[in-house]
């Protein structure tokens, strides 16, 4: 890999709010983040005061899975919900771009690189992608979210920005 190229790429912060995570799914997601091809990442995880999953268990899972980029984990003092937790995470992000991450996703290894390249090639401020839908055993049940939500409309350009203030069309896969 070209070291000079890596240095030139901006930092992308992955933010993840967790609450009562299924630890196997969280591990799979963290391993998929570890496998990202984009070279300049950081991860910030915030536990929304999970009552039955020990915070230490979440910390141990991250320590086991994340080895190639910096990460930090913290915990809310009380449960405030995902919106406020993601708001806090967004404020803490140091990257030029922010990738929002759900605790039960599994990302393809080139996801962040692909979204970053889309931002560059389109001179965009935001990018998002479709997703395959998997079941509890990680078997693909739909190769596109549109197979499950046929009324879902993907928007681009000025149509996206105008509509984004009124509704979310990104399904969480955004940067």
What are these regions (language model features)?
Residues 2-175:
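Nucleotide-sugar donor-binding/catalytic module of glycosyltransferases
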